[in-house]
Amino acid sequence: VRGLVDSNPIPGLRGLLKIPSSQSKAVLTADQIRAFYRALRAYRGYPETALCLRLIAFTACRPGEAADAEWSEFDAEGKLWRRPAAKMKARRDHVSPLSEPVLKLLEELRPITGAGRYLFPHRSGEGFTTPNRLTYAMRDMNLGERTTPHCWRTTFSTWANEQGFRPDAIERQLAHVESNRVRATYNKALLLNERREIMQAWADHLAALAHAGSTSDAAN
């Protein structure tokens, strides 16, 4: 009603109210994760595509970061994946610890693409694969309408928080930027040892689900 307030209060509320995003990603259930690994065992497409999806699942990286991953970024001896700032959404370098299954995955992939620059090169021979190819491959698994490779990030985050791991380490693993500037200034530690423990526990969790009712080693 006109005349009741001297100014519009809405601008002052901007940034305080969060609008639900229609793009929120689904969290994969245990049954969906089992179905994912069953689908991988039956997959008859390019092996690089299946391996890329496994890498995303194990590391909870963004699909685009996996798609353009380069062999030079991986330190097998140090068990680290070093992603340069230019490739990261937050525009800062990111170091991610690698679990044992990821190291085995790299050994499996190296004879296929190890002679080139990218882990997952484009089929044309130029550049790298596209996140869209990964999305289509995962949707063909019929895990659910909203399932995409990005779901592994929300699934990992949900699981890790439920397990009681420190939020700082989880957010660091996901390469999220701390919104609190003061907190961000004092939270520059890589937390590698803590994150290594988290990622190995996550890999063990996935392996248990993948092997449920199967003797296949698809998770490893």
Where in the sequence are the language-model features?
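Active-site/catalytic core of tyrosine-dependent DNA strand-transfer enzymes
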Residues: V27-R34, G78, P97-R146, C151, ...
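Basic, Lys/Arg- and aromatic-enriched nucleic-acid-binding interface segment
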Residues: V5-D68, E77, M88-R92, I112-T113, ...
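C-terminal secondary-structure termini that scaffold catalytic or DNA-interacting sites
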Residues: K89, E100-G114, P121-E126, E178-R181, ...
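Short, polar N-cap/turn motifs at the start of nucleic acid-interacting alpha helices
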Residues: S72-L80, G144-R146, F165-N187, A208-D217
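Conserved helix-loop functional segments at active or binding sites
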Residues: R38-A42, S72, E108-P111, D140, ...
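Short alpha-helical segment immediately N-terminal to, or the first helix within
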Residues: L55-I56, W159-Q163, Q173
